[in-house]
Amino acid sequence: IILILILMNLKKFKKLSGDASFRQFYRTNNSILVYSKIQKRSNLLNYDSVNKILIKNKILAPGLISQNYKKNFIEIEDFGNKNMLDKIKSSKTKLNEYKKILKILYQIQKIKNFKTQNFLKKEFNLSNYSKAKILKESYLFLDWYLSANKLIIQKGHLKKNLKKLIDNLYLNLKIKHKVFVHRDFHVSNMMFYKNKIALIDSQDAVLGNPAYDLASLIDDVRIKTSNSFKSNILKVFLSKFKYKNESQFINDFEILSVLRNLKI
C-alpha cells in the first residue's frame, strides 16, 4: 500500500503535527505513514525494531503494516488522536492515571531480551546509554542557550565551569544496572486507545539508568504538577519496585532530571 500512496499526492492525506525531528507523519483512512529524510531513514528501522520488542513483551506499540524503505516510508498502526496528556488534563483523578502509566514503566523495565530483527531481516539490539551520549545531550544547554545569550558568554569562564558541573553530576550517579529506557517517556508520547495505553516515539530507546524514564515522566516541564504530587508518584513507583537502596534511586532521579531537562 505504501508504494501506491507514494505515487499519489501526499497532500491528499492529513499531515500530523510531529516531533522536532526529520520525520513527517501522515494519516490515511486507518494507518499512519512515517516519512524520513533519506539521511536519517535508518531511524525507521530502529522504530520498527523497538516496537517489536515492546509488542513481544505485551506492551501496546504501533505494529508495522508495510514498508518501502527505498522511498523512506513505513506504514504503522494508528492509535487515534487522544494522548495521555489530554486525558490527564481532563481527569479528576490524575494520580490514578499516573499509576496506570507507572504499570507500563514497570513492564518495560522488566524486559530481559533486547534483541530482534528489523524489517530488512538484520539483527537489532538496544545500545547502551553511554556517558558520552548523555553528556553530549546535556551540553546542548551550553551550545544553544548560552551561545544565544552573548552577555552571559562574556562573563569569563561560565561555560567552562558549567561544563565541569555537568560532568560532576554525571559522576555522582550511583545505580550501575541497566534497563530498557524509552528516553522520551512523556504523557504526550502515550496514546489512550481502546482503554489501553500505547507507547509511541520509541525509536531512541536504549539500555540505561532505571531512574531516567521516571524523571522524564515526573519532571516533564510541559505539564504542571505540584511538588507534593510528584513526590506521591515517586513513592508509588518505589513501593512497586521495592528498591533495596531507595536513597541511591532518588539520588539518580534528581541528577538525571537536571541532566535531561538541560537539553530541552
Set out the residue ranges of the language-model regions.
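A short beta-turn/loop motif at secondary-structure boundaries
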Residues: L16-A20, S66-Y69, L256-S257
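Active-site activation/catalytic loop segments of kinase-like enzymes and analogous catalytic loops
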Residues: Y139-N149, P210-K244, L259-I264
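All-alpha amphipathic helical-bundle segments outside canonical DNA-binding/catalytic cores
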Residues: L126-Y129, E246-S257
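Active-site acidic catalytic loop and adjacent metal/ATP-binding pocket
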Residues: F22-T28, L33, I108-Q109, I166-L214, ...
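Short, Lys/Arg-enriched N-terminal segments with co-localized hydrophobic residues
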Residues: I1-L7
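ATP-binding glycine-rich phosphate-binding loop
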Residues: L10-Y26
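ATP-binding pocket architecture of kinase catalytic cores
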Residues: Y26-K136, K174
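An alpha-helical support segment within catalytic cores of ATP-dependent transferases
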Residues: N113, F124, A132-K133, E137-F180, ...
